[in-house]
Structures are given as structure tokens and as C-alpha cells.
Amino acid sequence: MRKCYVKEFHKLISYSEGIEIQQKAFDFVIRNNIDGILLLLQHKPVITIGKSGGKNNILASKYELDKYSIDLCHTSRGGNVTYHGPGQLVGYPILNLNNFQKDIHLYLRQLELILINTVREYGIKAGIKPKYTGVWVGDRKIAAIGVGIRKWITRHGFAINISVNKEHFKLIVPCGIKEFGVCSLEDFTANVDYNDVVQKIENNFKMIFETDLIKEETVDNLFERSNLNLRIT
């Protein structure tokens, strides 16, 4: 059985901190030839521009971004423009696909399946939309996916809306798609618990990738012994 480590962060993480954490985890996976590390967190409000994105899909002025304390960052992930913020669970799987299957399209479908299964556990009919990535409920996207892969090790990942401020999505053209909107779990289910979503994501991750997940205390001990500090102060 494969073995991955999972690190949950319990405070809001800036996007730049998230990039730094991913790079540390990426280097750790290479150096120790482990199967992977799953990072789970919530970001401080940020608009990110992927490789295929452009500022033409940002509708907000600098004044508006400053008013709402929203950062703007270019990123190496695939995809267009998206928003991250509180009430949205972001997952960064740093997986060594050399130990799984070296197939980028399969990897994307596996991420979609994790998210679809999780959303459906709340009684919500979620699925994919032909020609588009991510997970959808009707014509509204509930979870986005954007990845990067180097040396067959993955970076970036997915974001699932739980109780995110959807007004902030009005500041952009999400993923460059004008004709469709976004939604959150809370639109369909009252009182969704963030930690419950985390647990469901972890369970589906284990099932889809056929791996054990080693939890936080062991992870911190392992990283500290290896001089890898993923703690945010």
C-alpha cells in the first residue's frame, strides 16, 4: 500500500506562503522518494492568474482589490483566473506520480472524482461538464482544478467552495468562463462543517489513489527530523 502524508493548516495562509510550503514539500518528496504529501488549507483572499490566464479576466480595479484586501498573484499552475479565500478548502497534493501512474489526464480525472464523491456525500448532484475542468452542479462550478507537474511530481491542485464569499468571484471572470457561475456547498446544505469536508476529502483521496494517509502529529515529527519546517508562525 502506498503511503502519503497529510498536513492540515488551521490558520489562513497567504498565497505566497502556500507557494513556499509547496516548494518545501516538493523538494522533500524528491529527496526522500516518498509517495506524496497532501496539504490542506484555506487561503487569505487572493486572485491568481494561471498560465493560460490574463488580466483581461480581472474585472476589479486596484482600488477594489485594496478595499477588500485581495492580493493578486501570477502562478505556475495550469488554467486561467480564479479566486481563493476563507470558506474554501484548498488541496495541494504533492504526489510522486513515478510511484502511481505517469498519466496527467488520469491524474486530473482522479482529482475530479475525489471532489465529485465528496460533494455527492452531501446529497448534491455533482459531475463534470464536457470541455471544462473542475466539478459542477448544473451550470455552476463548485470546485476548481489547476495543476503543475515537474519531474512527474505534482503541485497546485484543487479548491472546493464550502461557504466562500461569492461576491469576490464577481471581481473576475472565473476560469475565463463568462457563461457559467459558481456555487458553494452551503447553497445546498445548511451548516456545512469545514472539518467534515476535510475528512471526506481525505477519505476519498485514500480510496481514489489507493494510499494510506499519515496524519498530522506523525507528519510534523517526520518533517522536523528532516529539517523541513512546514509550520506557519
UniProtKB/Swiss-Prot annotation:
EC number of the protein: 2.3.1.181
Superkingdom as given in the UniProt entry: Bacteria
Broad class of the protein's primary localization: cytoplasm
Domain BPL/LPL catalytic span(s) in chain numbering: 32-213
Reactions catalysed: octanoyl-[ACP] + L-lysyl-[protein] = N(6)-octanoyl-L-lysyl-[protein] + holo-[ACP] + H(+)
Binding residues annotated for substrate, in chain numbering: 77-84, 144-146, 157-159
UniProt-annotated site: Lowers pKa of active site Cys, residues: 141
Biochemical pathway: Protein modification; protein lipoylation via endogenous pathway; protein N(6)-(lipoyl)lysine from octanoyl-[acyl-carrier-protein]: step 1/2
GO molecular function: lipoyl(octanoyl) transferase activity
Keywords: Acyltransferase, Cytoplasm, Transferase
SUPFAM superfamilies reported in the protein's UniProt record: Class II aaRS and biotin synthetases
InterPro entries noted in UniProt: aa-tRNA-synth_II/BPL/LPL (IPR045864), BPL_LPL_catalytic (IPR004143), Octanoyltransferase (IPR000544), Octanoyltransferase_CS (IPR020605)
Cellular compartments annotated: Cytoplasm
PROSITE patterns the record matches: BPL_LPL_CATALYTIC (PS51733), LIPB (PS01313)
Active site residues of this protein: 175
Task of the protein: Catalyzes the transfer of endogenously produced octanoic acid from octanoyl-acyl-carrier-protein onto the lipoyl domains of lipoate-dependent enzymes. Lipoyl-ACP can also act as a substrate although octanoyl-ACP is likely to be the physiological substrate.
Name used for this protein in its record: Octanoyltransferase
Taxon lineage: Bacteria, Bacillati, Bacillota, Clostridia, Eubacteriales
Gene that this sequence comes from: lipB
